[in-house]
Amino acid sequence: MSNDILLQLDKILDARKTESPETSYVASLYEKGLDKILKKVGEEATETVMAAKDAEYTQNNDNLVYEVADLWFHTLILLSHQGLSSTDITNELQKRFGLSGHEEKANRSKNDA
């Protein structure tokens, strides 16, 4: 997925904040608030885990890709609701690029102390 599609989604999700919850699924989630959005992210995460297990057994990743797309989409809704965007995440990933996972975790632990 190119970053362009993420930026396009950011704009659309931001625009949905002013749309009617009766006509926009995303607007309805915003209206219901953080707990509803978190519930959807949790549901999508669970469905992603189940799809990954199924994919390992069936050797077919189609449903896994579908579920990860749902998870990403709902995570983008969460970010937008919190006043963040995909750019915040890609910037964080860029900061971590080139670090080993162990090094990144050690740096995180130092910052949390």
UniProtKB/Swiss-Prot annotation:
Subcellular location: Cytoplasm
Superkingdom of the source species: Bacteria
Uppermost EC category: hydrolase
MF term (GO), any: ATP binding
Annotated EC: 3.6.1.31
Record carries keyword Cytoplasm: yes
Catalytic reactions of this protein: 1-(5-phospho-beta-D-ribosyl)-ATP + H2O = 1-(5-phospho-beta-D-ribosyl)-5'-AMP + diphosphate + H(+)
Any one of the GO CC terms: cytoplasm
Family annotation (InterPro entries): HisE, PRib-ATP_PPHydrolase-like
GO biological process: L-histidine biosynthetic process
Disulfide bonds: none
Gene3D superfamilies: MazG-like
Keywords on record: Amino-acid biosynthesis, ATP-binding, Cytoplasm, Histidine biosynthesis, Hydrolase, Nucleotide-binding
Main location: cytoplasm
Family (UniProt): Belongs to the PRA-PH family.
Listed PANTHER family: HISTIDINE BIOSYNTHESIS BIFUNCTIONAL PROTEIN (PTHR42945), HISTIDINE BIOSYNTHESIS BIFUNCTIONAL PROTEIN HISIE (PTHR42945:SF9)
Protein name: Phosphoribosyl-ATP pyrophosphatase
Organism: Hydrogenovibrio crunogenus (strain DSM 25203 / XCL-2) (Thiomicrospira crunogena)
Gene: hisE
